[in-house]
């Protein structure tokens, strides 16, 4: 008999239910978490033993959305879900980031978390539900895990923080922030904002962390009732004697190596020291484990770098804690792109381009929460050569997708609306060198490339990565961190924004004890760094260029009566196809009668506008037009009078005398003046040649097209 154990509680405006014991009983732990009809089934499986020779913690998180959750069948050829979407990849990373630091350092057993969305309410995003589920399942499993964690989404509407806003509420919000953490510490923040102050951003983080305590309390209560026994796992005892011997041989030499400011030269020297020490120790005692020596060397290396920072000594590359590396900013470096920039900060460099397209270049995204169209794309590429390595080149990896989304969040708040700038915009950041914070270099490069392309962004934006080294109550916040400082430090804290405020904030914290004071120091230090970078960027380009590139399509907008849309499209699209072929333009029509004409040549666009005006012009009864015979029938002739319109000249209206045979008077393609006699309710036009050729008739209005 299946007996579920259920925990139900109120979480802001929503009711959350966590249920275990019903399904996937062969997994290490499984929970079904629901929040107002959005339900995510989360399983955890942990291997009891680590693989021999395992040197890293093999945690994988897979978040997957099933279309049946929204009552739909996949639209793919095989009618089933395929490879993970960008959204699924981003949510997998969102779950991974706060749980990874909570496993013991020496725990190397394989752990897999799978979160499957099985029911979705379009108003409730499944990502927070999945995070709560992962936390609950890991806490129930008995696997060594220093959780649970809580998770919350925070909005900012009418100057008030809103807990877990609905999809509709988020449209009105100036902030979309996700925060996750334990009872005592924030571990992860991911956000985008509409240029908010540092105080408002920090307030949102603190608000979200306070509110999520109810989640942690209820998971703890569920674990007390249904939790599995804790694993009998003990960390391998540290070989103190070997640690002391390694430190004696390597510490001073590694300290000298970390005074080499050039990255590749430093890496070469560090690798040589590690190889020498390992070889010397194995020569003395061949029973030693080379992998254990390497682990101890990594620990000594970390201690060398951290202790120097905490003592207030210069950093790896000789900088003080709040110094920014040298900047080099260039725009317009690629002649045929619509906009380009090369942004260099120390040994981190991004080549960024901006391309302008039409509405049909926009990305149509079919998500579980509904379909949407994205007219601003930002893609981030991290080729192996940027760090002096060889490797696979192909489709983007999880990291590239995540960094691209962060850079996009940083720029999104300053992008013009579709009515202000009716283009689809694609920004691509090619990381050509990397030594710390390439995603923030992408934000700076994107801002520069967009201005170079003539995109009327509201303000320039820049990004900076901050780091932290903390031991006890002693802490140092580092500005513009290197890759090594990111790896060996306790926090990765990225902030993007304009002179007026923050547009994106991302935090990943590896330790507990990060207080509001520390986050405040980091945010304030980041603001100073951001303003410094913006000052240098403004020397290269301070405002968007007045015109777009000569190689970019020009988009002209006109408005017609929505009732005339059918005339412009024509039967089966015949008229609009003929128009695009004739004028060499791209024409897009919206339901409200807005027409967008894209052309690289202004004259072609003007020609298309003129033709559309002719097609949509009202036919005036009593006016004489120049027409062309298009069809001859027994009872008269059809005559085109321009703009794709055609009327009938009845046989009785061809001449003043009786006409026995139409072809005696008219031939196909013949130009004739015609007078509009009537337009009936169905839009049919009755014409007369006889009335147009009377002595007192006025001159014809226009030539037929």
Curated annotation (Swiss-Prot):
Annotated ranges, domain KH: 553-612
Instruction: Family membership, please give it.
Output: Belongs to the polyribonucleotide nucleotidyltransferase family.
Q: Name one GO molecular function term.
A: RNA binding
Q: Which organism is it from?
A: Yersinia pestis
Query: What is this protein for, i.e. what is its function?
Result: Involved in mRNA degradation. Catalyzes the phosphorolysis of single-stranded polyribonucleotides processively in the 3'- to 5'-direction.
Protein name (Swiss-Prot/TrEMBL): Polyribonucleotide nucleotidyltransferase
Gene it is expressed from: pnp
What is the superkingdom listed in this entry's lineage? Bacteria
- What cofactor does this chain's UniProt record say it requires? Mg(2+)
Give the reactions, separated by semicolons, that this protein catalyses: RNA(n+1) + phosphate = RNA(n) + a ribonucleoside 5'-diphosphate
